Amino acid sequence: IFYFGKQSDAKIYANGNLIKNTVLNFGYNAVNLGLPPVAKPTKIDLKVIAGDFSMKNSVTLDPVKKWKIKFIQHSHTDIGYTRSQTDILAEHLRYIDYALDYCDATDNYPDNAKFRWTCEASWPVDEYLKCRPASQIERLIKRIKEGRIEITGMYFNFDEIPDEKILAASLQAVGRIKDKGIPVKLAMQDDVNGIGWCLNDYFNQLGVKYLDMGTHGHRALICFDIPTMFWWESPSGKRLLTFRAEHYMTGNTVLEMQTGDIERFKNNLLNYLISLNSKQYPFDEMAIQHSGYLTDNSPPSTIASDLIKQWNDMFVWPQLSTSTAETFFSDMERDHSNDFPVIRGAWPDWWTDGFGASARETGTTRIASSTLTANEGGLSMAASAGIKLPNEINKSIDLADNALLFYTEHTTGYSESVREPLGQPTMEQRALKESYAWEANRRTASIGEETMGLLQSKFTREEQPSLIVFNTLNWKRSGLTTVYIDHQIIPRGKTAGIFDYDGNRLAVQSVLHRSDVTQWAIWLKDVPAFGYKKYIIKPIDDNQISNKVSDNKVLENKWYKIVTNPAKGTIVSWFDKEQSLEMIDQKNEYQMGEFILEQLGNRSQMESRRLDDFKRSPLDTIWFDSMAEGEIWNSIKFYGESATSEKPKGFMIEIRLFNNEKRLDITCSIIKKSIVSPESFYIAFPFDIKNGKHFTEVPGGVIEAGKDQIKGSSNDWYTIQDFAAVRNESTQLVIGSAEMPLMQL
């Protein structure tokens, strides 16, 4: 009510009946009116009288839902975002202690206002059970059984950088927690707008029935127009009841619960429910997530309990209650399970691009994870052969997995890293984060050495130096491996002759020379499934094999003809002889392997999800370096420089055409400048496969991009696991990337 007189008592009438006595002050007055509910849109005539002032208006009163709102309090686990990684565990352990105390402090509250708490991540709970006294653990278990505290299944919040093995390792904590008699029926992922598809299958195996996804639309799109509950179907056909919730701190960002101001909370909540209803949210029940305070890694508080108690004293409905997430899910499943749609598809995450800011460590982590998988296969071979494994080997594997988990959890920067890119907290967070990648690399290498030592014990020593290659996969393998061979065995100037026991020499090619050793590439043939092959090493003269250097700019074998453009260091023609097919789109503005630097004119474009102020640039300079011919591949190498690379020779691209397989490798490296302004660079792959469709491997399976995924999930870029492909009815081109996962298709 806008009133411009002196303060005055006022009466408000509806359809002639007095419904409110109030006081009007000069200016804007907000007045809550209590009106009986209606079953259909109903016209209400309102009248206000305050002394000589009066006004009339008519409004249409619509039917309203008898809302039941459940408030789910949690602390978002963001390791290193609000303070150093070294502080976060102690904080979250303390929060569980506080949660127990707050349960005690609100035991005399009405049940719907009693303090309740959801432990968002299982990591702090797992550690809590290891370090707290038995009496405190008993308190925790008691409150869990009462439904006052809830334990969930996600170890951390993960995007798609971790592979299936890492995600499986993250769930070991659930087993330890359940061994204590603690139920884990729900997984909660917050602040990440996607999740590995394989987790759906994993959760089903663990008895986890529900998945709560607390979104965050900053620089990302959100799936679905409204909060949506659905049956998410896994690659194997299993189903998980899943809720795409609102922002994981809607209670703080929208409702301002942390202020404790009942009037502010009341107005914000009513406006939120009006908005939710206008979007055709179909149910009367809703869950709203919040933290004790408006921050990640927030301590719990009893503010919500006090607000809910005040609200319920004022209103019959909407009914508010504190709740665990599982209670909301179980109620919805009981009342509406047949109303939820079934959606089968991957859920790619928008925020994985953050790992592009730590490309070196991300690549190292991917290599470490795949190497650890191979090493575990080697340990299985050893155990199958009757070799006793070391007592500490499982602990070593757990420590390697732990490093992988801490690197791949979703936090990629300190909260002030954009404003203070070189500040002490930013640099500390960065250093600690990247240390996990190198720790994983180191621990994995040690496990590999231990594995080889065990397997070696089953083999006799040969008169001549020998090499044993193990295949830990369950199918026969041919392909490339590399090995360092000391000059004591193969002198400098000689070639490594690698012979099988039938006297057949394998194709080899030198890769790197040092004073004491040479690294050799070896092309292996038919190493048995879950088996091995043994080879003899002896020096042969260099002149027995071709290893020439030339300045030709064309590469050709029986499958492909590759024509390069020395002026740009790119490929202008990639001709498939078998199919008489040109593989490159000749009309594309970018050539195959072309370097593209993209720089933004302003950072705000990322927040507003637009791109209208940017510059794309090729390399500043590029030059031909060399061409080499070898037994395994022939290659052309170019060097270049860019504004984003160090000098000299900041960028390298090598094109390798293989002689033993229908395969082309394009290897790129950059000595990157440290730049804090928003930028990115790309390597172009403009393939021309007629009517081709894009496919990519995600954690959990292979999808057709844009089709086999939840609508609204990331499609500007994909986090490739091992490969992507373009295929039509007759042709398939497969791209593998061991280190770099981000591709735009």
Question: What label would you give each PLM region?
Answer:
Residues 199-202, 218, 228, 253, ...:
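C-terminal (or distal) subdomains of carbohydrate-active enzymes
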Residues 2-69, 515-566:
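Extended acidic/polar, glycine-enriched regions
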Residues 138-146, 196-260:
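Surface-exposed loop and adjacent secondary-structure segments within mature catalytic domains
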Residues 121-126, 155-160, 184-195, 217-220, ...:
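Conserved short loop/turn motifs at secondary-structure junctions
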Residues 75-78, 226-456, 472, 501, ...:
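Active-site and substrate-binding clefts of carbohydrate-active enzymes
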Residues 73, 79, 110-190, 238-247:
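Metal-dependent polysaccharide deacetylase catalytic core of the NodB/CE4 family, i.e.
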Residues 30, 40-45, 52-135:
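Active-site beta->alpha N-cap acidic-glycine motif
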Residues 167-205, 270-290:
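CE4/NodB-like, metal-dependent polysaccharide N-deacetylase domain
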